[in-house]
Amino acid sequence: MLWAAGYLCLSQAQIAPPPDYDQKLSGVTVNATRSDTPLDQIPLNTTILTKEVLELAPDQTIDQILKNQPGVFLNDQPYYEKDPTGQSLNVRGLGNARTLVLADGSPLNDAFYGTIMWNLVPLSSIDTVEFIRGGISSLWGNWGMGGVINMNTRTPKNSQQEVSANYGTFNTVNLAVSKDIMASDNMQLRLSADYLNTGGYTNIATISPAAANSIKPGMGAAAAENSNVRLQSYFKAGTDTKGFVRVGYGTMADYSNAMSIATNLKQTTDIAAGTTTKLSEGDKVLVNLFYQKTAFNKQNGSNAAVSSVFNAQKLATNTPYISSNYYDPYSTTGAGVQYIKDMKGLVDQVLVGVDGRNISGSNLTNNLTTTGAVSSVNYAQGQQNFYGVMGQAKSTTSFIPLQTTLALRIDNWSSSTPIYYNTGPEGKNASYQNISNQNKTILSPNLGFLYELSKEWNLRSSIYQAYHAPGLNNTLRSYASSSGGNNFANPNLTVEIMKGFEAGTDYRWKEGFLQLTAFTNQVTNAITTYNLKANNATDVALAQQLCGAAKGSNPLKAAAGNCVSTSINYYTNNQNLQSQGLEMQFHHNVSPQWAVDAGYSLTNTILTASSTSDPTGSQVAGVPQNIGNLGVTWFPVPKASITTTMRYVGNSWMDTAHTLPVPAYAIFGLRANYEINQSITLYATAVNMLNRQYITFGSGSNNSSYVLGMPQAFTVGGKFTF
């Protein structure tokens, strides 16, 4: 597929790219920079994917298209086949929930879990995707370690209607409709809705090195159902102000961890608005705000064990039952103002801004026995606040073609957890924790250089500091299970800090481009889970407090208080990690009929310090060192295209101790497009075209945790505009 490339949208549908589109793309403004910076002036490794490029990809969800971007670690499993708590994004091996994802400048990161709400932005609604790698906390604050991905959605056009529909393997149905309304010269509306339903596939692996008996009774295909409705309004308020308002509601339902008796339901209301006011030539003010409210009802299923304390009904071993249910209501509200002034002289542009955000939520967990009785309850309620001030200046010297960008942001982060308790059976014997408020001021600088060797060739480098605050799932969500013991949230967690440097080059010629980037990142206070030790006095005291156990007891040697097991896990900041690597993106138009794309990433991510059992100096779990892509597109006629892709993922490990290997694999994809006329385009795709059976990368604790990669899947569909 054509990736790491894009081109300007034309006035009518077009399958083949226009001439010199790589050169034209270089001047496209990247909204994720917050400063109207053209692509060829960004000192960080940056990619733009346009709608036309997205439509050449065999994959049918935006997460699976992004997995082919160098530096992205998303396994070969569509988001809807994953539990909502596992729909994460890892960039440059830095770990999940450390990269910011936006839709039209508003966050798509789940406010509680930090995962990505891919379901709220179906592929049919996306116009372009901007991807800036590297530390960007200087502009965006939290989640700014791995970079930022901004999806620009489609805007109203000519009062048209559009229907996109496809059907594929596993009875997967995807339907999207939209209606554009040109209400007046100053008001345009877009009303859209989409629906996805799939029978899914059984993604629990039983091929080597997975355990052959990993699929237990009650486990099956990961069926899922998503739906969204959205109303977008774009308006002009006078000659100098334009703005937008977006209101949406989305649902996502699936089986929890492929257990057909356990269901998940996530319901999200999403509101965003913004204005841009031109004060004078080169001066403007931007105002934006957003609000999201989510209700997440989740069940977990387990298989009974005769010896388990949860098996009060004495069910036969492996009999499925609901082992817990959760209710997580949460919301986030944010707003910001920024001022941009273009200047002449020593400084070319100045940006200043201020913003704030609140995240509030709670978690109620009922841990259940096989009879449905409540064995214990975990509850916590809390909030986090972020307030930031930022500034950025750009300067280009006249005597040498060097552009310098200096950005600085100061954030104040606070966290409060007024209620945190764990109970015994039926909610009795509650053990309350008194939690001190957390408060930290964080400095996020970024200094970037871009040197123009020629019109086609530049060198770039950037040094930065970024941060990531603990998620509410780390500070509020506690639970127990028959297999994993007691897992407690830690409301005393603090922020992670990353220091990084990268250097690269971009070379663009008439028929293509080549981008090369080297990076190094150091993360301190990295959040991880820690298994409390029975011979550690500090751990024993903490276990007594969490379990509500009597002094003198040791819940880590014998179950005591409200704890159902001697296995007690707790989140901690006691890890440091290092991520270093290389990224390469290449595109070349061999002829008007042929185009070639290639990409490669080499990523070495290790722990440099750890208080857990994870060893230092070893490649961390879920991060393959080598990932490569190759794509070839043929345009037999201007209205048709055939794209074939190859994705290679090298050897990796499910655990950092390197006891659970994940073998390397390569898979192939295919897509054919044909534009019948300006109103009708048909397509057919194949994912895993050769039907390879393979285990995709991830993390886990035993050989029953392996995940099967996407099996062979065919899709046929069309887009109809009228």
Give the location of each predicted region.
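N-terminal Sec signal peptide and the immediately downstream disordered periplasmic leader
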Residues: 1-59, 63-67, 181
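Extracytoplasmic beta-strand/coil segments of soluble accessory domains associated
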Residues: 63, 67-106
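Short acidic/polar hinge/loop motifs at secondary-structure boundaries
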Residues: 89-90, 106-133
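Periplasmic-side early beta-strands and strand-to-turn transitions of outer-membrane beta-barrels
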Residues: 150, 158-159, 166, 172, ...
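Face-selective signature of the C-terminal outer-membrane beta-barrel domain
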Residues: 234-250, 267-427, 434, 450-452, ...
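Outer-membrane beta-barrel signature, preferentially recognizing the C-terminal barrel domain
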Residues: 263-278, 328-330, 378-384, 434-444, ...
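Gram-negative outer-membrane beta-barrel transporters
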Residues: 396-404, 412, 519-522, 531-534, ...
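C-terminal beta-signal and adjacent terminal beta-strands/loops
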Residues: 467, 519-525, 529-531, 648-655, ...
